Amino acid sequence: MNTESLALDFKSATLYAIRVVLHDADTTRLRAALDKRMADAGSFFENEPVVIDATRVDAPVDWPALLQALADHNLPPIGVVAEGANLQGARDAGLVPVELSTPVARAPQVIDTAPPNDVATPVPSVPEATAEAAAKAGPQDDEAYGEQADEAPAHNPESVPTRAARETTEANRPTATPPQSSSALVITKPLRSGQRVYARHTDLIVIGMVSQGAEVIADGNVHVYGPLRGKAMAGARGDTSARIFTTQLDAELLAVAGVYRVVEDKLDRALHNQPALVRLDGDTLRIEALKG
């Protein structure tokens, strides 16, 4: 028997990563935009692998400075999509050229003119979780939620400087959205600041308050029967039909299938602290009042 063949093997794999789309090559503006996006999102996007897309800029990128800015926010770059001199500069900085499963189009940017209170900008879905835990909390919190909840994967930021899109990079083919389980994960205690709950391949139901600084994430729908004051993400692996439901909307961040909105200002009076649902309409995040 050839023992060397048992030491390793090659398998095809799918890697979920942030595609950070550059619309400007100026280092100062890039860093400022990155700082703002990460400050808005808190820990949502930390430790996500990054693929940098520089196909929309012609000016030379300062690659070492950009890589340092990403490292300062715990965003490890794993590859680059670029052309010409920028591709060579990225190679010289140690980045590996990659191909995306979705071709990159150099189309002009479209400005969304929908009302600001019910729209958002597109960002990526989340990667496969590797740890199993109920929330980022102490032992008594883990015990309370049991083994049904996985630790939520880190999330992905809006781009530098304006938009980023989640792309699936794969050696052979894109993958389909994972199937949803029929059994929802139910949390019957309030979630405090710093706690994170992730429902893998299913819906998440929280009976109680989701406090500011807490995060609730599901591959299916998210239901919060209580005040939603933290961050909520439904359709975490790309299910565009997923929705967020809450009996009292006062969220910090809302996301469905990679389209997210940071709620910096109070919502319209008809939505703020009212029953509401959040859904996708194309690439636009819609926030609507729930009426009995």
From Swiss-Prot:
Keywords: Cell cycle, Cell division, Septation. Pfam families: MinC_C, MinC_N. Residues 128-137 have a biased composition (Low complexity). Residues 171-185 have a biased composition (Polar residues). The keyword Cell cycle applies. Residues 112-188 are annotated as: Disordered. Coiled coil: none annotated. Residues 140-150 have a biased composition (Acidic residues). It comes from the Bacteria. One of its GO terms (biological process) is division septum assembly. Cell division inhibitor that blocks the formation of polar Z ring septums. Rapidly oscillates between the poles of the cell to destabilize FtsZ filaments that have formed before they mature into polar Z rings. Prevents FtsZ polymerization. HAMAP family: MinC. Interacts with MinD and FtsZ. Belongs to the MinC family. This is Probable septum site-determining protein MinC.
